């Protein structure tokens, strides 16, 4: 449930924010809560953007923003290495959306184009969310496959 090691995040902006009501609902917190938002684009290579990602981390982890994109290490693993916070549970939601104008030009699509939005919430052993990533994939740039295997009882 993570991206290939062949992809890389490029940080576009990083800032401490108080989340608005819409963002709070999406990431599962209260409006006005303090988070550090890392706005980034995930690339397959230097020319092919796969998705726009807004990564929200707790304020005490904000200094990891400088480490994002140095290599292909996922953000939650950077937090684990730097702070010892281990992801014990990850919740993932997928839903359809449409891309905002501010992100469309970076992704090379028209504003309002359809997207697949994936929200991942990373929780520590106490159940506290320490990272939320909101990834927005323009149509045709992400495939999610699940294989289900039915076993028969031969009793």
Regions of interest found by a model, annotated:
Residues 1-4:
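Short linear motifs at protein or domain termini
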Residues 6-155:
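C-terminal all-alpha effector/ligand-binding and dimerization domain
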């Amino acid at each position: 449930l993570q991206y290939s090691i062949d992809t890389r995040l490029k940080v576009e902006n990083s800032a401490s924010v108080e989340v608005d009501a819409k963002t709070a609902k999406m990431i599962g917190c209260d409006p006005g809560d303090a988070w550090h938002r890392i706005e980034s684009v995930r690339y397959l290579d230097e020319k092919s953007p796969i998705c726009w990602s807004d990564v929200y981390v707790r304020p005490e982890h904000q200094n990891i923003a400088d480490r994002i994109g140095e290599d292909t290490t996922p953000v939650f693993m950077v937090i684990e290495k730097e702070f010892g916070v281990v992801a014990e549970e990850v919740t993932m939601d997928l839903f359809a959306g449409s891309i905002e104008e501010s992100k469309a030009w970076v992704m090379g699509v028209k504003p309002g184009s359809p997207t697949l939005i994936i929200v991942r919430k990373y929780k520590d052993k106490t159940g506290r969310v320490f990272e939320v990533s909101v990834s927005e994939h323009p149509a045709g740039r992400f495939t999610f496959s699940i294989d289900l295997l039915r076993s028969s009882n031969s009793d």
